[in-house]
């Protein structure tokens, strides 16, 4: 298996948790207090992504050209549900709501909260084995010399996963950094398999859609670890020095 060492380190991490019972008004007020962002027109998914990004901003120096990659299984479900109800039950066309949710809105608002004007990309992904780490893989493969990239995973409540909490997880990648957890890329001989139904059901009971990603972030620097991303693996090593360990900044509403 070929191993590529791109001289990239994870230097910061953050996690924001909430749940469907928490109203949008509270999330908007929290974001306003945290970053001064005018959140009046933000979707719930954008609020969740931006609140997590704001925590990451407090963990390290974010440069103006920092890129932002965000993985999410869908655009804002609540906006789409409202739009579908208006169209199907009230026969009211909602073209602007439809168009407004087919773009990078959540990652754009996360970048605004981070204070960066770098490249942004929303990656359609699920918690299944072959897609969940695609945002990190894309960021690692596209990071220029001396560059930065904030990589996040956001989730807004969906009826199909009734017991899962909402939230967003973020890490900061830096090329050429002196401290942090190194990331290496390894090629696999075959594509990783999807988890079994039993494994998926177990993940459902863990209470968080991105639970496996959250566990991986918690273990950064604590032990050797490997994350599968399609035909690649993203490998991290146990930190040999205290300065290289990652502490995840957390907040919950």
Regions found by a protein language model. Name each.
Residues 1-97, 101-133, 141-147, 152-253:
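Conserved "HGTGT" condensation-loop signature of ketosynthase/thiolase-family condensing enzymes
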Residues 138:
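Aromatic- and glycine-enriched pocket-lining scaffold segments that form the walls
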């Amino acid at each position: 298996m070929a191993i590529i060492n791109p001289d990239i380190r994870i230097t910061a991490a953050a996690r924001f948790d909430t749940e469907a019972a928490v109203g949008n008004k509270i999330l908007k007020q929290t974001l306003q207090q945290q970053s001064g962002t005018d959140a009046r027109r933000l979707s719930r998914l954008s609020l969740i992504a931006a609140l997590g990004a704001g925590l990451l901003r407090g963990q390290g120096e974010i440069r103006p050209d920092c890129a932002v990659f965000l993985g999410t299984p869908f655009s804002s479900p609540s906006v789409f549900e409202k739009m579908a109800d208006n169209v199907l039950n009230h026969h009211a066309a909602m073209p602007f709501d439809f168009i407004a949710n087919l773009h990078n809105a959540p990652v754009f608002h996360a970048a605004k909260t981070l204070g960066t004007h770098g490249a942004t990309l929303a990656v359609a992904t699920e918690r299944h084995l072959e897609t969940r780490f695609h945002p990190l893989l894309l960021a690692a493969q596209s990071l220029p010399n001396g560059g930065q990239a904030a990589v996040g995973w956001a989730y807004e409540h969906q009826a199909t996963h009734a017991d899962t909490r909402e939230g967003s997880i973020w890490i900061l990648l830096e090329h050429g950094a002196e401290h942090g957890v190194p990331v290496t890329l390894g090629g696999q001989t075959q594509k990783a398999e999807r988890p079994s139904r039993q494994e998926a059901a177990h993940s459902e009971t863990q209470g968080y859609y991105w639970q496996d990603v959250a566990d991986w972030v918690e273990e950064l620097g604590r032990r050797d670890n490997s994350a599968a991303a399609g035909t690649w693996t993203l490998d991290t090593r146990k930190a040999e020095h205290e300065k290289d360990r990652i502490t995840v900044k957390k907040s919950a509403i």
